Amino acid sequence: MNSYNIYKKNNEATILYHAIARDEDQVMELAKEAGIDMDGLRIELERANVKDQLGKPLSARIEDALIY
């Protein structure tokens, strides 16, 4: 699994979503399932082969990256 940041194409300073997925196609699938419109957004690989504290691969997910 890999870690991805998702942000607007014209504003790379603000990450909108964070995803754990095997590839960008899975990020797109997760976004669709979550009702996230990816039009105008960019996916960027943050880190490859991410694992939890015990060294196990993380499960696929997408979450809001903004802190309110």
Label for each model-derived stretch:
Residues 13-23:
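A short, exposed loop/beta-hairpin motif centered on an aromatic-Gly-Thr core
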Residues 1-14:
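Short aromatic-glycine-(Arg/Gly/Cys) micro-motifs in beta-strand/loop hairpins
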Residues 33-68:
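Short, mixed-charge low-complexity intrinsically disordered segments
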Residues 23-25, 35:
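Generic helix-packing signal
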